[in-house]
Amino acid sequence: MTEDSDDVTLVRRCCGGDRQAFGTLVVRYQKTVYNAALRMLHDREEAKDVAQTVFLKVYENLGKYDPKFKFYSWIYRIALNESINALQRRRPTEGLDLDAPDGEPGPEESLGQRQAHDGLQRALMTLREEYRAVVVLRHFVGCSYEDMGEILGVPEKTVKSRLFSARQLLRKALQKQGMTQ
């Protein structure tokens, strides 16, 4: 039995009231959900909160899951949406922290690197959610175009188009900051 078909079986059991089946799904996907949130938020406590919210939403909406799609993609999309919601709740001066979680820049990091990092963070935060999501999924999570399309619920061509547009918008935002040639 593949993990996909096993997930569908677990979802059906959950919908039938089997709490142990839901516990199995939580154990199977808790690291995936937490890491997805952590990569977007770069805050361990906030990522834990988002992960809890994700599993609550998953439990409440299991009846809406369409087994034609991978459960992984469905839950990852919920995690991504909840992470974006958490980013929006932050104060405007806070943003997408690209440092290692809870990490401070090391002594080897030069002022120029720090300025470039801060400039990129500011530029990313100027992007609309749909563009920021593709940049984060591709360049920070390392998703394939196919996986991104499934997670975002759009065709692969749309993913590529959004990523192209996002890169152009990032380039313009960085130019406004005097960060590119």
Placement of each model-derived feature along the sequence:
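Short, charged helix-capping/linker segments at alpha-helix termini
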Residues: M1-E3, C15-T24, Y34-T53, E156, ...
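Internal acidic/polar
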Residues: E3-D4, N85, P92-H117, S144
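Sigma70-family region 2
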Residues: C15-G16, R39-H42, T53-K70, R89-R91
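Structural recognition of an alpha-helix C-terminal capping motif at a helix-to-coil junction
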Residues: N35, D49-L56, F69-N81
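Arg/Lys-rich amphipathic alpha helix in sigma70-family domain 2
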Residues: G63-P67, R77-L96, Q113, S165, ...
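DNA-recognition helix of helix-turn-helix
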Residues: S73, L80, I84, E146, ...
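Short, Lys/Arg-enriched C-terminal cap helix and immediately downstream tail that follows
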Residues: Q88, L127, R132, R167-Q181
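A short pre-motif secondary-structure segment
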Residues: V134-R138
